[in-house]
Regions:
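Short, high-confidence coil segments that cap the C-terminus of an alpha-helix
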Residues: 1, 86-89
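PAPS-dependent sulfotransferase catalytic core
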Residues: 1-79
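N-terminal/domain-start segments enriched in small and hydrophobic, helix-friendly residues
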Residues: 66, 85-86
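Short boundary motifs at domain starts and secondary-structure transition points
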Residues: 80-84
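PAPS-dependent sulfotransferase catalytic domain
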Residues: 88-178
């Protein structure tokens, strides 16, 4: 297994899911840097909310991922690998993967895809509480533009995540150990 793909709408707490996997010995953590961290006290205490590379339109990596299905496997892997220099499985996180589950499954059939879902209003509320457009990493303002557009995008991403879950099934972990 070369990659673990993760899809979740902003505010779905998908980054928390990723952190539970990230510190495993088998994960390549070379994408981590102080520039790729976001700390916030939304939970009541200062906590690391985002760590490592995020891939989405308008962000540091994955600018073309809105149309990822128009690119070759080799072009995609070159972009996946760009922030990494180490060994191990690479976690590739993208909100827009929600719309491209079929493409990921077809091109990387041996790589797991983690779908993180949370109700639309809960996603938007948590994202706003965590800093919304003031979040310093990853940057949301270029692609997501404003709160109205963000709300629509969260709805669309969650819809496609639920549809992919219905199409492909999978496991629903009961706790962090199941991850």
């Amino acid at each position: 297994m070369k990659y673990i793909f993760v899809a979740g709408a902003p505010g779905s707490k998908w980054s928390s899911v990723c952190k539970n996997i990230y510190y495993s010995d088998s994960i390549d953590q070379s994408d981590a840097s102080e520039n790729r961290e976001y700390w916030h006290d939304a939970s009541g205490q200062l906590d690391l909310m985002h760590i490592g590379a995020y891939f989405d339109p308008g962000m540091e990596f994955g600018d073309f991922f809105g149309d990822i299905n128009k690119y070759t496997k080799e072009e995609c892997e070159a972009e996946f690998d760009r922030p990494f220099s180490g060994e191990g499985v690479r976690i590739i996180k993208s909100h827009v993967f929600a719309h491209h589950i079929d493409f990921l499954k077809d091109n990387w059939p041996d790589c797991p895809i983690i779908l993180v879902h949370r109700d639309n209003d809960a996603c938007l509320g948590w994202w706003v509480r965590c800093g919304h457009f003031d979040i310093t990493y990853p940057l949301y303002h270029k692609y997501y533009v404003n709160l109205r557009e963000m709300s629509k995008i969260v709805d669309d991403q969650n819809r496609d995540i639920v549809n992919a879950w219905k199409r492909y099934g999978g496991i629903s972990p009961k706790n962090n150990i199941d991850l």
